[in-house]
Design a protein with these regions (language model features):
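Intrinsically disordered, low-complexity Ser/Thr/Pro/Gly-rich regulatory segments
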Residues: 1-165
Length: 165
């Protein structure tokens, strides 16, 4: 189980899209205990041969502090991810994405070596994909609770949003 809403949403989305997902993976075991880092979400789609490391964040830190934190996380990802999916031939490149809530891409299209994706853009992608899938014929599986909720909000948006006026 993910530690927060954003990690859970990202993990559900990639699982729903056919990826094998690892969450909150401690990597780089230290001799005296503990780990070098923790990778929030790592997803692999063997059919597409796509490997992605996602670090969602709700922080409002300075860009300098974010740069240091995400650089450390993404470097650990490049170092340790190749060992996480034993038995699979992984692609040589790992797509790395920082998903941010409180940010703008205008001055910061990348962070720590990864691409910046705003939560609004992720939500748009999800809503566009789910928007064409009626629950009666294409219900999101029940273990993807956030995605299923979004699917119902999309399906019943007129009734839902009319009550807010």
């Amino acid at each position: 189980m993910a530690n927060n809403f954003l990690e859970q949403l990202v993990a559900e989305w990639y699982e729903y899209k056919g990826y094998f997902v690892r969450r909150n993976v401690p990597v780089g075991r230290r001799a005296r205990g503990g780990h070098e880092s923790e990778l929030d979400v790592v997803a692999f789609n063997p059919t597409l041969r796509h490997l992605v490391h996602i670090e969602p964040s709700l922080d409002a830190e300075s860009w300098d502090k974010r740069e240091r934190l995400f650089r450390r996380k993404f470097e650990a990802g490049r170092k340790y991810i190749p060992d996480l999916f034993d038995g699979y031939e992984l692609p040589p490149d790992i797509e790395q994405i920082a998903i941010l809530v409180f940010a703008s891409r205008s001055n910061h299209p990348t962070l720590g070596g990864g691409k910046v994706l705003l939560i609004s853009d992720l939500m748009r992608q999800i809503m566009e994909d789910l928007g064409g899938k009626k629950p009666i014929a294409n219900l999101v599986p029940e273990h993807h609770t956030i995605l299923r909720t979004l699917q119902f909000v999309i399906e019943y948006r007129k009734k839902v949003f009319d009550t807010l006026r």
